[in-house]
């Protein structure tokens, strides 16, 4: 209810804007009396594009109606009687309005709540001490609104001038008719006697001279009025062009740029409501001026007076038609982009919207929108107005949709919910270009009739570039193409040109944005992380980020050529890091438990002076998406150890926290945080003992060289430690792998956890053996439940 309390404190223009949000579609009284209930409902949890959420929307509608009915029943007394009737009427009205379209109720209330919050936020910013210095964005919006007020006043002025011209011309025509009547009277003078004729003729001549003098003077006045009106319209159109340029070429383009960066994980592009309100104001003022110009043309045709006005009016009429054409075609936009990595035979969605649909009555004859997929070359030809003969580069199913007008929000949009790319036709590739570097775009096109079919516009808009894949394995490289395009595309480019090289700081910004979005973390890439990445990319050892600021990164370096000495590209390695964090380690990254971006030598330097049992987690150089444990432990042979990397597959079997919990000689997370303090909350609870006569096996992470160390450390027993061992045959009988710790340690200091050592397979084989002939006194063969790397599926 706090939101409604704040909304009631709005004043002036903000209060008027809030009042406009309400009407028959949702009365303000309902908002007032059900404020607490409305603000406590999960309106944002419903996906308006998902038909499966209709049931939840219906429940909210029913709940709203029930709450209104209850509120009505509780009204007593004389004052409560009228309110009871009114609330009951609103309950019936809302039920009838939204019964068949409950999603529209959700859309309406979300629209109201969003704008209420925006108005309250803007009011608070202006009234707070910090709001005295209005930020640049608010200042710009203020200037736009001031220009609209100026345009409104000018348009009202030309309306008054037009009315004055019309009244003056009507009186002129009356007097002109009087002049014609006098001329007719001259023709009738011959029927009078000479004395009467002379007397009458003198009076008529005096009247005619006086009237003709007046007509000449008034004709000049009319011409002057017409010229002045045309000149005022010229000035109005100049201001309109300037305002439209600010809104369409600045604000709308900035929104589209934010939408593009949001594809890389940037902040959401924001609501279109403010932009739509500006575009609607533009449309309203443009249309008013167009009607004025046409009325002025009609007056000139009604009473032709030689002069420059006809040419002036023809010019302003052509200009205002160009202005309205630019407005309509530019405000046909893609509100929800199709996925930029588009897999064939997979359902996808998109939403297009016309920001001026309501004001220009386009919705009175709902237009149909068609979607087709075209190549980069076809997009270039389209923008050059070359004849593409309706060419396309593939077939999209369910690619036609009728635009719908939502009365509550005033939006005209088409929701493509079930499109699917059936097939794709690729162009011949250039040089080293792969299929995941080829860009397409979804073309949306329609035809709009404006002003009772006075004007008809063919409108088209292109989606952000999409990369088409046919298999999930292509997703990572396709994402690299999209990331580079979204990050470094320049305004007004030829489709879909991007720089082949960018500065390292530019790439850092794009990587950090993508990283935080993928990992869903506010903990982005630090200066040290970026230095590590620069060292990896440029194969340089400098530890100063500034040394890399002037260095350029080419697309080939980013994701075409392998890194020196490795069989993967820079992007593939970085993408693997994001994937393993996203799937398995988001909480650990957010806790700061994963240091990550350090190499083996850096890990050595960090751990060398730390107490035994101190460890850190870093991203592997040798395994894409791998995480390895480096730790300090003094022994006769060495004091620093590295475990062979774990990958996503390993963490799907046993979590990182549980693996660390198994290794009791790992005590401190670098630099000095107790391991259990960091990871204990993520340990899997110990299973209860079996009660059905069966023993449940459990995997335990063990490094053979440290079995004694683990025992000496006083490890708490796991379930497998506590459970009685199953009766097994002697090791030679089953050809089990003998304990052989020597190969586990590789020559450069990493444990090589043999992939062939699959404990799960042997456990399953063992449990399938007949047990009758086995000696119950025999214990499991050595090494059966211990291995440096174990898995149980």
From Swiss-Prot:
Look up the coiled coil feature and give its residue ranges. none
GO CC field:
cytoplasm; cytosol; nucleoplasm; nucleus
Occurrences of domain SH2 (ranges):
589-686
**What Gene3D superfamilies would the database entry show?**
EF-hand (1.10.238.10), SH2 domain (3.30.505.10), STAT transcription factor, all-alpha domain (1.20.1050.20), STAT transcription factor, DNA-binding domain (2.60.40.630), STAT transcription factor, N-terminal domain (1.10.532.10)
Q: Does the keyword Transcription regulation apply?
A: yes
Q: Which domain of life is it from?
A: Eukaryota
Q: Where in the cell is it found?
A: Cytoplasm; Nucleus
Tissue-specificity statement = In the virgin, found in most tissues except brain and muscle. During lactation, abundantly found in mammary tissue, as well as in other secretory organs such as salivary gland and seminal vesicle.
Per the UniProt entry, the disulfide pairs are: none
Post-translational modification note: ISGylated. Tyrosine phosphorylated in response to KITLG/SCF, IL2, IL3, IL7, IL15, CSF2/GMCSF, GH1, PRL, EPO and THPO. Activated KIT promotes phosphorylation on tyrosine residues and subsequent translocation to the nucleus. Tyrosine phosphorylated in response to constitutively activated FGFR1, FGFR2, FGFR3 and FGFR4. Tyrosine phosphorylation is required for DNA-binding activity and dimerization. Serine phosphorylation is also required for maximal transcriptional activity.
A biological process term (GO) from this entry: mitotic cell cycle
Sites where Phosphoserine occurs are at 128, 779
Q: Which UniProt keywords apply?
A: Activator, Cytoplasm, DNA-binding, Lactation, Nucleus, Phosphoprotein, SH2 domain, Transcription, Transcription regulation, Ubl conjugation
| Residues passing through the membrane, by range | none
Q: Which residues carry this modification: Phosphotyrosine?
A: 90, 682, 694
Please give the Pfam families that the UniProt record associates with this protein.
Answer: SH2, STAT_alpha, STAT_bind, STAT_int, STAT_linker
Q: What InterPro entries is this protein classified in?
A: p53-like_TF_DNA-bd_sf, SH2, SH2_dom_sf, STAT, STAT5_CCD, STAT5a/5b_DBD, STAT_linker, STAT_N_sf
In alphabetical order, the GO MF annotations are: DNA binding; DNA-binding transcription activator activity, RNA polymerase II-specific; DNA-binding transcription factor binding; phosphate ion binding; RNA polymerase II cis-regulatory region sequence-specific DNA binding; sequence-specific DNA binding
Q: Tell me which PANTHER family the record gives.
A: SIGNAL TRANSDUCER AND ACTIVATOR OF TRANSCRIPTION
Q: Which family, according to the similarity comment?
A: Belongs to the transcription factor STAT family.
Role summary: Carries out a dual function: signal transduction and activation of transcription. Mediates cellular responses to the cytokine KITLG/SCF and other growth factors. May mediate cellular responses to activated FGFR1, FGFR2, FGFR3 and FGFR4. Binds to the GAS element and activates PRL-induced transcription. Regulates the expression of milk proteins during lactation.
- Quaternary data: Forms a homodimer or a heterodimer with a related family member. Interacts with NCOA1 and SOCS7. Binds NR3C1. Interacts with ERBB4. Interacts with EBF4. Interacts with CD69.
The protein, known as: Signal transducer and activator of transcription 5A
The species this protein was found in: Mus musculus
């Amino acid at each position: 209810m706090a939101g409604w309390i704040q909304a009631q404190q709005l004043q002036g223009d903000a209060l008027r804007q809030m009042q406009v949000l309400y009407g028959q579609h949702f009365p303000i009284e309902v908002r007032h009396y059900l404020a607490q209930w409305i603000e406590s409902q999960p309106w944002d949890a419903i996906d308006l594009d998902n038909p499966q959420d209709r049931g939840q929307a219906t429940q909210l509608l029913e709940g709203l109606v029930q709450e209104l009915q209850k509120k009505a029943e509780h009204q007593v007394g004389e004052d409560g009687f009228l309110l009871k009737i009114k609330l009951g009427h609103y309950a019936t009205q809302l039920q009838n309005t939204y019964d068949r379209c409950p999603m529209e109720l959700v859309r309406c209330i979300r629209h109201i709540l969003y704008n209420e919050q925006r108005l309250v936020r803007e009011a608070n910013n202006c009234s707070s001490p910090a709001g005295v210095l209005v930020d640049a964005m608010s200042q710009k919006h203020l200037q736009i609104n001031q220009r609209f007020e100026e345009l409104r006043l000018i348009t009202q002025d030309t309306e008054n001038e037009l009315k004055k011209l019309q009244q003056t011309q009507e009186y002129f025509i009356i007097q002109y008719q009087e002049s014609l009547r006098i001329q007719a009277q001259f023709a009738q003078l011959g029927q009078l006697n000479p004395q009467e004729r002379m007397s009458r003729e003198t009076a008529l001549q005096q009247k005619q001279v006086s009237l003709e003098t007046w007509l000449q003077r008034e004709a000049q006045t009319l011409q002057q009025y017409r010229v002045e009106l045309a000149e005022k319209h010229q000035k109005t159109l100049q201001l309109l062009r300037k305002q439209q340029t600010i809104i369409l070429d600045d604000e709308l383009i900035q929104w589209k740029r934010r939408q593009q960066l949001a594809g890389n994980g940037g902040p959401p592009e924001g609501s279109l409501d403010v932009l739509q309100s500006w575009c609607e104001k533009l449309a309203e003022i443009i249309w008013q001026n167009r009607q004025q110009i046409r009325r002025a043309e009609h007056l000139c045709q009604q009473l032709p007076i030689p002069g420059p006005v006809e040419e002036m009016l023809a010019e302003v009429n052509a200009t205002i038609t160009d202005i309205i054409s630019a407005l309509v075609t530019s405000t046909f936009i893609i509100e929800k982009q199709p996925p930029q990595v588009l897999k064939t035979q997979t359902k996808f969605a998109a939403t297009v919207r016309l920001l001026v649909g309501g004001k220009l009555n386009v919705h009175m004859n709902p237009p149909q929108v068609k979607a087709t997929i075209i190549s980069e070359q076809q997009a270039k030809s389209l923008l050059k107005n070359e004849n593409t003969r309706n060419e396309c580069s593939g077939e999209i199913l369910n690619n036609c949709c009728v635009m719908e007008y939502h009365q509550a929000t005033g939006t005209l949009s088409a929701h493509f919910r079930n499109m699917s790319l059936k097939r794709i036709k690729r162009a011949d590739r250039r040089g080293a270009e792969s299929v995941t570097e080829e860009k397409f775009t979804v073309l949306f096109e329609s035809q709009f009739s404006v002003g009772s079919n006075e004007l008809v516009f063919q409108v088209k808009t292109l989606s952000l570039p999409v990369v088409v894949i046919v298999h999930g394995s292509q997703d990572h490289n396709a994402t690299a193409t999209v990331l580079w395009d979204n990050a470094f595309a320049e305004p007004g480019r030829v489709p879909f040109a991007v720089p082949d090289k960018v500065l390292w700081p530019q790439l850092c910004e794009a990587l950090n944005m993508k990283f935080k979005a993928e990992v869903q973390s506010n903990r982005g890439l630090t200066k040290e992380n970026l230095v590590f990445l620069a060292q990896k990319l440029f194969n340089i050892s400098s530890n100063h980020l500034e040394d890399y600021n002037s260095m350029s990164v080419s697309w080939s370096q980013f994701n075409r050529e392998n890194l020196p000495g490795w069989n993967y590209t820079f992007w593939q390695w970085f993408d693997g890091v994001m994937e393993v964090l996203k799937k398995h380690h988001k909480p650990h990254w957010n806790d700061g438990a994963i240091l990550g971006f350090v190499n083996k030598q850096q890990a050595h330097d960090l751990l060398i002076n730390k107490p035994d049992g101190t460890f850190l987690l870093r991203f592997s150089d040798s395994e894409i998406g791998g995480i390895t444990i480096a730790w300090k432990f003094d022994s006769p042979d060495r004091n620093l150890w590295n475990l062979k990397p774990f990958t996503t597959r390993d963490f799907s079997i046993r979590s990182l926290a549980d693996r660390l919990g198994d290794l009791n000689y790992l005590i401190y997370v670098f630099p000095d945080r107790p391991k259990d303090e960091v990871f204990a909350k993520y340990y899997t609870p110990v299973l209860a003992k079996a009660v059905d006569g069966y023993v449940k096996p459990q995997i335990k992470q063990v490094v053979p060289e440290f079995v004694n160390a683990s025992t000496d450390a006083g490890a708490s027993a796991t379930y497998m430690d506590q459970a009685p061992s199953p009766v097994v045959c002697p090791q030679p009988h089953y050809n089990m792998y003998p304990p052989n710790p020597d190969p586990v340690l590789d020559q450069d200091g990493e444990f090589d956890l043999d992939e062939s050592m699959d404990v799960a397979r042997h456990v399953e084989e063992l449990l399938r053996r007949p047990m009758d002939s086995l000696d119950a006194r025999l214990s499991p063969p050595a090494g059966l439940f211990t291995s440096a790397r174990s898995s149980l599926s």
